[in-house]
């Protein structure tokens, strides 16, 4: 088996083996572009490393060394040589781009002797020692996990003692002093072990570090957020160094062939003169726009533009390129399809179709369905913005508007933000690192002091759809005491600020945001998607406002209308409580009759908004105790209204308490014990449907869904009650309206006996939230407490409540579909759990033959696009 490939031996199709970066370097080499040469250690070598107890086998090591020898001959330099040493960079490169997840090591091969030879050869001792101190810092951080901050602190102290501001002002002697101090830090951190002087030891250490980084906590989190399997592994690219820090005719930069925020055509990027590549990406210094390169180095600019256009034409997609200029000679270090905002992705896809570079099908396949979430992003309310007080501005790194309380660490943001206390949070950092990813995910917005438009914060925030403003150098931040100052204003932890990620403006206070509006390209792309998909898309909604929004976003009806939400309103909750706590059927019916007008009014409003589109109504599902009063004053008021004592009412409430309510007295079990509930709901629904049909002329066919059925006889019992009342209402109103009765498949037993249940049910809708909960045997509300340990120990890679577990729960769905169709070949099949808007789950539902998926209103576009992508991938057509 071959574990190492020279760049010239690979091509773009070998992505799974060489990783994205390695495959692109090979492709660019074969296109004859100026690429520093090197070799790629494959993803299979990474898998072998883990299978081998985290060791690199002798076979792989020998192959690496043999390729290193060939590289020495090609470059005419020797590794570890004291007169003209070969230096290399070591970078990771997985199949899928994982920005900032894996770290780079530059200048590998330097040691105490080689640095002197390097200084002589380049006739630039300052440059040689600068390269060496950077290498010690990176190697210590990435390979040996010595915190970066130790080294930053030494640099800051030295600059302060010399009275200088920039790294570039350090002299040769200063840099030699840094090398000495850095080695001391290494030795102290490594229990007295000296910094490695053998370049081969350095190289093998770096390769192992890249393999190890595939499994660091932030990589695991990123993979979970982006559905990347853990067994893919990462490749390692070893590439001969070129230097952007050799003086004023050298430089380094990052550029995109189109704007990654807006999608506008034209080169967008930035560079630094006399710097190394990681300085731009890590956002340590704030760079110049690429257009200025035309003034600084016109020849390089011309060649750069030619190659950039050639790469975009070759890949037929927007490219993200890293380049270095060494003493006036341009080199490309990598290219990849650029990360972009959802807005930019849609514009680029539509423009490429108009430019005849890709087909409409390719355009639909190119959009990451999950990213459509970002399009529905808030902007500032124009009136509120006019009155806003702008305190500064920086780079608009990721679009959207955000306002929230300031927190200075990722942990605090996580604690207070989304998934924590649920506050609106703005994460403020000197610069973000990949460790901050969970804090960024919990925040409404991110503000950084350092870094450009292509820094870690910018790239990750764009990918998440989080608003980000970066590179605000005027901020003085005191992370220890948790405050920062900007233009004379002081902001402490917990104070509100507002960020505009589209303009880069920073405002004092909490500015009101307004929801997003969608561009014309979105409509074009979605109409192409709808022309390919065969799977229907409905929404989960239980009020006219959500229904209206979902239909605007393309929903074809309602797949789940939860009736219990209609009872929680102030004027209704006392009536439902009265019904629950009544002692006799008569009292219960009396209380329920008071609810009919409310429930009927709700259904009428929904049907009017739907204008003839279908609606599946789920009968009362939650355990009754959820409706009961807990506050003393509510109990007193209800006791008075029901003419009973407070003690009696409390006893009654306690009697309804359940040990395990999610598996208790809920769903169709309520209708079995209290048939009057199902009667009331049927009357309200049928009257509403008949009246709207007569008033507005819509063709309405009510779909009545009985929840939590586990047995055919159970369904028949409730169905008989429903049919009796429905027929009675039809007779009273002299109507011939049709209606369908179906069930939720959410108890595993229902899936196992779906052929029997289909004898009574005219449709199934899979309630995958409960089905997941009951199949795994853990509660959705409590699973979060232990699932993290499952991810860390690689028992699960994904949250089964967010992404359907296709091996277990999915098999129950598949079985129920097959059994249901055996009994009733034309049975309508839907899914209304949260999984209905998750792309990989939608693809699965399409493959097993469901009729439609139903999801929350804002996920409707995601489901439409995912359904189209599933159809295109399978070769199926409308």
Locate predicted features.
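Structural motif
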Residues: 237, 407, 426-428, 447, ...
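Flexible inter-domain linker/hinge segments
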Residues: 207, 214, 376-408, 524-530, ...
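Short beta->alpha connector loops at strand-helix junctions that form conserved
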Residues: 39, 449-451, 470-473, 561, ...
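Glycine-rich phosphate/ribose-binding loops and adjacent secondary-structure elements
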Residues: 329-331, 433-441, 445-447, 453-460, ...
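Conserved alpha/beta-domain cores
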Residues: 91, 518, 528-878
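Extended, non-globular alpha-helical segments
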Residues: 393-435, 486-524
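Nucleotide/phosphate-binding sheet-loop regions of phosphoryl- and nucleotidyl-transfer enzymes
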Residues: 1-388, 414, 423-426, 433-438, ...
């Amino acid at each position: 088996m071959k574990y190492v490939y020279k760049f010239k031996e690979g091509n773009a199709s070998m992505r799974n083996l060489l990783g994205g970066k390695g495959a692109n370097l090979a492709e660019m080499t074969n296109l004859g572009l100026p690429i520093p040469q090197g070799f790629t250690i494959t993803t299979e070598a990474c898998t072998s490393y883990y299978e081998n107890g985290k060791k690199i086998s002798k076979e792989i090591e020998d192959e690496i060394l043999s390729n290193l020898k060939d590289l020495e001959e090609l470059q005419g330099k020797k590794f570890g040589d004291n007169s003209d040493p070969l230096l290399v960079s070591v970078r990771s490169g997985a199949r899928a781009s994982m920005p900032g997840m894996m770290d780079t090591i530059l200048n590998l091969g330097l040691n105490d002797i080689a640095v002197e030879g390097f200084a002589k050869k380049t006739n630039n001792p300052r440059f040689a020692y600068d390269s060496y101190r950077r290498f010690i810092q990176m190697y210590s951080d990435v390979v040996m996990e010595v915190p970066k901050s130790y080294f930053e602190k030494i640099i800051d102290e030295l600059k302060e003692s010399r009275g200088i501001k920039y790294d570039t002002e350090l002299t040769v002697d200063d840099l030699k002093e840094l090398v000495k101090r850095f080695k001391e830090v290494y030795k102290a951190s490594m229990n007295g072990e000296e910094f490695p002087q053998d370049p081969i030891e350095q190289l093998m250490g770096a390769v192992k570090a890249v393999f190890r980084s595939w499994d660091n906590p932030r990589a695991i989190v990123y993979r979970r957020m982006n559905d990347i399997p853990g067994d893919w592994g990462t490749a390692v690219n070893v590439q001969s160094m070129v230097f952007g820090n050799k003086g004023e005719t050298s430089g380094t930069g990052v550029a995109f062939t189109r704007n990654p925020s807006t999608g506008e055509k034209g080169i967008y990027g930035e560079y630094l003169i006399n710097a190394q590549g990681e300085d731009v990406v890590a956002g340590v210094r704030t760079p110049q726009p690429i257009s200025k390169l035309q003034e600084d180095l016109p020849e390089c600019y011309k060649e750069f533009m030619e190659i950039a256009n050639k790469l975009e034409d070759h890949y037929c997609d927007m490219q993200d390129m890293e380049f270095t200029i060494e003493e006036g000679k341009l080199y490309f270090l990598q290219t990849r399809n650029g990360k972009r905002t959802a807005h930019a992705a849609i514009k680029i896809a539509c423009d490429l179709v108009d430019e005849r570079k890709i087909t409409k099908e390719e355009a639909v396949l190119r959009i990451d369905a999950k990213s459509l979430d970002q399009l529905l992003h808030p902007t500032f309310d124009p009136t509120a913005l006019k009155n806003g007080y702008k305190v500064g501005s920086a780079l608009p790194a990721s679009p959207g508007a955000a306002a929230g309380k300031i927190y200075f660490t990722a942990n605090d943001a996580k604690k207070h933000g989304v998934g924590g206390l649920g506050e609106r949070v703005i994460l403020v950092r000197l610069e973000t690192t990949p460790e901050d990813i969970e804090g960024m995910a919990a925040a409404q917005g991110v503000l950084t002091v350092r870094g450009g438009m292509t820094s870690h914060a910018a790239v990750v925030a764009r990918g998440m759809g989080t608003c980000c403003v970066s590179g605000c150098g005027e901020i003085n931040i005191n992370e220890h005491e948790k405050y920062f100052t900007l233009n004379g204003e002081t902001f402490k932890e917990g104070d509100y600020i507002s960020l505009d990620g589209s303009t880069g403006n920073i405002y004092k206070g909490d500015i009101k945001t307004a929801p997003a509006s969608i561009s014309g390209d979105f409509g074009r792309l979605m109409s192409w998607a709808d022309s390919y998909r065969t799977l229907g898309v409905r929404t989960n909604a239980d009020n006219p406002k959500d229904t209206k929004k979902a239909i605007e976003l393309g929903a074809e009806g309602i797949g789940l209308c939860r009736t219990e939400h209609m009872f929680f309103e102030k004027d209704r909750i006392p009536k439902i409580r009265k019904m629950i706590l009544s002692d006799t059927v008569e009292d219960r019916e009396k209380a329920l009759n008071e609810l009919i007008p409310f429930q009927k009014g709700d259904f009428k409003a929904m049907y009017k908004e739907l204008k003839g589109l279908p609606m599946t109504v789920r009968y009362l599902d939650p355990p009754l105790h959820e409706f009961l009063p807990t506050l003393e004053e509510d109990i007193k008021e209800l006791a008075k209204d029901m003419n009973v004592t407070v003690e009696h009412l409390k006893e009654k409430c306690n009697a309804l308490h359940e040990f395990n309510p999610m598996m208790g007295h809920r769903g169709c079990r309520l209708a079995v014990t209290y048939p009057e509930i199902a009667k009331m709901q049927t009357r309200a629904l049928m009257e509403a449907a008949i009246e709207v049909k007569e008033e507005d002329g819509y063709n309405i066919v009510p779909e009545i869904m009985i929840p939590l059925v586990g047995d055919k006889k159970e369904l028949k019992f409730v169905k008989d009650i429903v049919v009796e009342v429905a027929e009675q209402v039809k007779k009273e109103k002299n109507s011939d309206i049709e209606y369908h009765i179906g069930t939720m498949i959410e108890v595993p037993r229902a899936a196992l006996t779906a052929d029997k249940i289909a004898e009574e049910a005219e449709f199934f809708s899979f309630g995958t939230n409960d089905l997941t909960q009951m199949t795994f045997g853990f509660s959705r509300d409590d699973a979060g407490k232990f699932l993290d340990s499952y991810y860390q120990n690689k028992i699960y890679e994904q949250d089964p409540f967010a992404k359907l577990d296709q091996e277990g729960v999915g098999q129950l769905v598949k079985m129920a579909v097959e059994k249901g169709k055996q009994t009733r070949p034309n049975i309508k099949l839907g899914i209304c759990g949260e999984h209905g808007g998750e792309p990989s789950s939608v693809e699965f539902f399409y493959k097993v033959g469901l009729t439609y998926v139903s999801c929350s209103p804002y996920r409707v576009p995601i489901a439409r696009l995912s359904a189209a992508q599933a159809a295109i991938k399978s070769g199926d057509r409308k």
